[in-house]
Design a protein with these regions (language model features):
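Extreme N-terminal starter segment of soluble prokaryotic enzymes
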Residues: 21-25
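Short, acidic Gly/Pro/Ser/Thr-rich loop/turn segments
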Residues: 33-35, 88-90, 165, 267, ...
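Classical Sec-dependent N-terminal signal peptides that target proteins to the secretory pathway
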Residues: 1-20
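Hydrophobic/aromatic beta-strand patches that form the interior of the parallel beta-sheet core
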Residues: 26, 81-83, 156, 258-260, ...
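Lipolytic serine-hydrolase domain surface
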Residues: 37, 228-230, 249-388
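Active-site catalytic motif of lipid deacylating hydrolases and related acyltransferases
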Residues: 28-151
Length: 388
């Protein structure tokens, strides 16, 4: 009996070791997926893409060379994890369609048709951008990430189309890149508040944990300002709960390994982040610093024929990112890389919805960009190639 028990314990330990670096791929839907037909289209596309992507990922030995955490025990969950938020916008879209029915009697057929297309394809993208809609989606996504983490899985988020808004906001709101003491100093809080914070140090936290839904420290305004709770005594009391709220609100520590955005229109909808006067840039700098220092990668992969696949930025080396941000990045290992020139061999009218049917081409590009992105940022020989 003892021998059997010992064997069981050894097998359990072996299983835990083997699964230590198992990855879950979480796929996040885009716009126009809020009815049953489109939901099924999206989910069927993911189920066809995932095994092809998984196979290419596991076969590529260079990934293990450049990403040291992905050692010989690397495994990827066989089933895709599908995070679907499209149903949450359906009630609002139904209201828009009712208003369209009113216009049908007074508009030309061409105008009515154009309005219908705009509403169908852009409504969800506009809907999910609104803070009061986005925040519950982020909390639900975080529960999905936590569930995978509780099973011993690291995660890579795959954001499709308007799903790239969700991945961006998830990193912005859920990564623990905020040092509370430095935050209060930056915001020029009252001296007695800063002294209180220094006397009661807390761990790094995330934007979500600071909000009134959690710790009640403050909220980010539409202008990009973090507005502190004006009740100083309540602010101090709330501050002491930050560590607990960080545990509840922020991404599980070390579990989010990367993001792959594709069919990405994020530049079109979030162009204000390029404005130096927009204060969210301060937090974006901290977020990117965290990404680079914690070995997280952000890839953007677009078909060149995709009219909604916008390049996110010019590719920069790790040193150039540091210079551009104006912050010190210590021992960077993260990757931020854009490849918006993937040839899908599809016409422009079909390219945005062809990432599933052209899954071989798309999967090959993702795996190639994992490697080339790392080499671009850290390999001087690769950086100096004439092609770049």
């Amino acid at each position: 009996m003892r021998k059997i028990l010992l064997i069981f314990i050894l097998m359990l330990g072996f299983n835990l070791v083997c699964n230590a670096n198992e990855l879950s791929f979480i796929y996040i839907n885009g716009s126009n997926n809020n009815d049953e037909k489109m939901k099924n289209w999206y989910e069927n596309g993911v189920k066809k893409l995932h095994p092809v992507l998984r196979k290419r990922f596991l076969k590529n030995s260079a990934i293990k060379k450049y990403y040291k955490e992905f050692d010989d025990k690397l495994a990827i969950k066989e089933e895709p994890v599908i995070f679907f938020w499209g149903d949450k916008s359906k009630t609002d879209l139904d209201f828009v369609k009712k208003q369209l029915d009113i216009s049908k009697a007074i508009s030309s057929s061409g105008a009515y048709f154009a309005r219908s297309l705009i509403a169908q394809y852009l409504h969800d993208a506009i809907w999910v951008q609104k803070t009061h809609n986005m925040l519950p989606v982020l909390d639900e996504l975080n529960k999905t990430v936590e569930k995978e983490a509780d099973s011993g899985h690291d995660v890579i988020l795959y954001g499709y189309s308007a799903g790239t808004f969700v991945t961006y906001q998830y990193l912005f709101n859920k990564l623990p890149y905020i040092n509370p003491e430095k935050l209060f100093e930056t915001l020029n809080a009252d001296k007695d508040v800063i002294d209180f914070v220094k006397a009661n140090p807390r761990k790094n936290t995330c934007i979500s944990a600071l909000s009134y839904n959690y710790a009640g420290i403050g909220n980010v305004s539409s202008a990009g300002h973090l507005i502190l709770n004006q009740n100083k005594e309540q602010l101090k009391k709330n501050y002491l709960t930050i560590d607990d709220m960080t545990q509840k609100a922020c991404a599980p520590e070390g579990r989010v390994k990367g993001v792959v955005n594709f069919a990405c229109p994020i530049v079109l909808f979030y162009s204000d982040i390029s404005d130096n006067n927009y204060e969210l840039n301060f937090y974006n700098r901290l977020m990117i610093k965290y990404i680079m220092e914690h070995g997280i990668f952000m890839l953007t992969v677009n078909f060149r024929e995709d009219p909604l696949g916008f390049p996110t930025s010019r590719n920069l080396t790790a040193k150039e990112i540091e210079q551009r941000l104006g912050v010190s990045i210590n021992n960077p290992t993260g990757v931020i890389y854009d490849d918006s020139g993937v040839w899908s061999k599809r016409c422009f009218a079909l390219a945005h919805t062809s990432y599933w049917t052209a899954r071989g081409t798309f999967s090959k590009a993702i795996v190639k960009d994992f490697v080339n992105g790392y080499k671009f940022q850290y390999d001087e020989k690769y950086q100096n190639r004439k092609e770049l």
